[in-house]
Amino acid sequence: MSNIHEHKILILDFGSQYTQLIARRIREIGVYCELWAWDVTEAQIREFAPNGIVLAGGPESVTEDNSPRAPEYVFDAGVPVLGICYGMQTMSEQLGGKVIQGVGEREFGYAQVEVLTDSALLRHIEDGISDAGKPVLDVWMSHGDKVSAIPEGFVAVAKTETCPFAVMANEDKKFYGVQFHPEVTHTRQGKRMLEHFVMDICGCDNKWQPASIIEDAVERIKAQVGDDEVILGLSGGVDSSVTAMLLHRAIGERLTCVFVDNGLLRLNEAKQVLEMFGDHFGLNIVHVDAENRFLEALKGENDPEAKRKIIGRVFVEIFDEEASKCVNAKWLAQGTIYPDVIESAGSATGKAHVIKSHHNVGGLPDDMELGLVEPLRELFKDEVRKIGLELGLPYDMLYRHPFPGPGLGVRVLGEVKKEYCDLLRRADAIFIEELHRADLYNKVSQAFTVFLPVRSVGVMGDGRKYDWVVSLRAVETIDFMTAHWAHLPYDFLGRVSNRIINEVDGISRVVYDISGKPPATIEWE
C-alpha cells in the first residue's frame, strides 16, 4: 500500500478567509497538506517534515508592530516556500525586503499581471499576451500593503500597473511570493500555479486519491480498534454515513449503528436510511423510534436555542442508553471532519486559535469511557463526498442540500408539534420534487420550506378555510457565509404553491423568502 502521507505540504495560517481554500486546492491536486497556525515551533515543523511550506494570506499589516511573522526556521528548513498575499509580504520583510502601506493604491478584485521573466512557478501559464508581447495572467487581488523592495537574491517575475512586485522569486532557494490569490477561482490559472509549486518545485506525487484514502483509513481503523466492537450514531447525513461505510469495510459485524428517529426528519427519511444501510449494505443497525420522546421534551418551548439544546440533550440520553446495552463496545465512532478539527484547535499541533468548541454528536457524556474513532478527521467535506461515491453511496444522498442537526425542530418556528412537522414534511417534499423536475435543484445551494405558526384565510371551492402558512427558501452561495436569495422563475414558484395548497390539507398560503445573508441568516432559527 502506498503511503498517502509520504509527500505533504504545510500551510501556515495568518487569518485569511481563503486559507482553507488553499488546502482544498492542494488536496484536489492529489497531495496531502495540513493547516497550522503561524506561530508553530521549529520542532513541530521538523516533526511534520513537509516537502514544501505555504505562507497564507491574512488581514493584518506587516508594517505594524506585533503583526504575525513566519517562524524563522521556515526559511532554513531547506524546502520550497510559497508566500501568498500577506505571506509574500512577511517573507519579503523577514528576508530583508521592504513592505509599505498602500495609500490610495489598494488592489481589490480582478487585476491583470504581466509576466516579466521566466520562473518555475509560472512557466507555460498565460491568459493572454500584453502589447509588449509578454504573457498576461488574470488574477484576483485583495491587498492594501505592497512589497516596495524585494530581498537580495530575488527577482521581480511579474507586475501590475500599481504593484511592481506582483510575483517575486528566488529560484536558487525555491522561494516564491505572489501578491494575488491563486487559490480562488477568479484567478483563472491559479490551480496550475499551485500544481507547479507542489508537483514540480516541491517534487510531490499525487498519492492523495479517494481509493488510496479509503485503503489507508480501513487499515488505520483495524490497527486502532483491533478485535473490539464500535458504536456509531448514524444520522443519515453525509459524514456519519461515510464513517459507517468505512467502519463496516474495516470491521464488518463488529460495528453497531444507532439510528435515532427523532420525528424531526424529512419525509420518508428514516425509512430510506434503514433500507439503504440495513437492507442494502447489511450494516448492523439499532433503530430507536423516539418521536414521542422528543416532541414531549419540546412541548411549550418557543426559543430556538433552547430547542436546539433540548434536541441535543435528548439525543445524548437515548444514545447513552443504547450504548450501555452494547456491553462489548470499546470505541465510539464520530464523523468529525477536518474543518471541525481546525475550528476546535484539535489539530496535532494544538496551535490553531480556538474559534468554537465542536461536539460532533452534541457533547456525549465524559463517563462513557469509550475510545474515539474519527476516520474522517483529515478530510474536507468535498473529499468525504468523493470517498462516499467510491464506497458505493448514492450521488443524490451525498450531494443533497445541507440539513440542520436539529432537523425540522428549527424549521418549525416556535413550538414544535407533530401536526406542524407532518404538514412541513409534505410541503417540503413537494418543493424539492419540483426543483428536481425543473432541473433547478443543483442550481441552488440550499432549498427548504419553513412552517410559520400563523393562520391565514384562504378560499377552497365555495368555502373559506383558515389554515397555516409556509415559506419557501432557496439561496445561492459559495461558502454559506454570505448568500443571495435564488431568483427562481415565477411560473415555477406558482406551480409549487398550487401543489402545496391543493395537496397538503392544512396549508392555505405559501410565501417566498427574498432575504439575503446578511442581514438574514439562511435558516430562520
From Swiss-Prot:
It is an enzyme of class 6 (ligase). The keyword Transcription does not apply. It comes from the Bacteria. It catalyses: XMP + L-glutamine + ATP + H2O = GMP + L-glutamate + AMP + diphosphate + 2 H(+). Its EC number is 6.3.5.2. HAMAP family: GMP_synthase (MF_00344). Catalyzes the synthesis of GMP from XMP. This is GMP synthase [glutamine-hydrolyzing].
